[in-house]
Regions:
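Vicinal oxygen chelate
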Residues: 2, 42, 94-140
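Core segments of cupin and vicinal oxygen chelate
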Residues: 10-60
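Short connector loops at helix/strand junctions that flank enzyme active sites
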Residues: 4, 46-48, 73-77
Length: 140
């Protein structure tokens, strides 16, 4: 597995409005809303490719296909994504992680916004994504 860089970090927000008050209003981070979503994010914070505030309901939908986080699964507090070279490398990395004993939450798939990602829950309770986001690979 060849991880190229940390693609993104997001806090998981059970209460997105309160989290927005902290990260946008109090800290002054330049987070923008995603259309039709409570997800706030920025690609313009120095030292970070992507930082987001991800509503728990949207994280549950992305991982389990339901807005409710399963009661028998540790509720995550954050998500970190590691970028690989291409969509095929996401599948390969997910297979390697599974072979090493780490059960995926879901296999590699393309999200509606064009990112290919496979996710698992870490022993620490983080959502860990192996991803390929085409916009991170475009020539400057």
């Amino acid at each position: 597995m060849d991880i190229e860089f940390v693609a993104g970090f997001a806090v998981i927000a059970p209460d997105p409005a309160t989290s927005r008050r902290l990260y946008v209003d109090a800290l002054g981070l330049p987070l923008e809303a995603s259309a039709g979503s409570d997800y706030f994010h920025s690609e313009g914070i120095a030292g970070s490719k992507h930082f987001g505030v991800w509503p728990l309901a949207e994280a549950a939908q992305a991982c389990f296909g339901s807005p409710d986080w399963p009661a028998d699964v540790t509720v995550p507090q954050a998500s970190v994504e590691f970028e690989v070279a291409d969509p095929g490398a996401v599948t390969t990395a997910a297979d390697e992680l599974h072979a090493a004993g780490f059960e995926p939450v879901h296999d590699a798939r393309e999200e509606p916004w064009g990112q290919t990602v496979a996710r698992l829950l870490s022993p620490e309770g983080l959502i860990v994504g192996i991803s390929y986001a085409p916009w991170f690979h475009q020539a400057d």
